Amino acid sequence: MKVIVDNKIPYIREAIEQIADEVIYAPGKDFTPELVQDADALIIRTRTRCDRSLLAGSKVKFIATATIGFDHIDTAYCREAGITWTNAPGCNSASVAQYIQSALFILQQTRGMKLNQMTIGIVGVGDVGSKVADVARKLGIQVMLNDL
């Protein structure tokens, strides 16, 4: 199996080289029809637009994006061409929750704010927002949610 991988994805080498026969690392902006022509799979980020102009006539059957969003993948073309794709929903949610927790502790330490007297508003209660809400509640913070 030949896989073309965006060279800016951290820690990918250890994982992919165990399962692929051939791996080529390239900057995401440098993926060309010639580069992907005989690849079986692509592992990308948002810098690589996966559409007909890149994929037509290639052997690509699988695309993985190391991102939450997938607007850089032409999903209609993939469906038409029989290409399976996946994204990484929630891949940064724990990090965001940890960052917010740290920021709240800094507010408490530098401004003397009491966490159990705070109210936090969260707009968007998907994977990230719900983890931030859980952290805030555990710290005794009143949480207000909006998910329209």
State where each predicted segment sits:
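Phosphate/diphosphate ligand-binding glycine-rich loop within oxidoreductases
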Residues: A41-G112
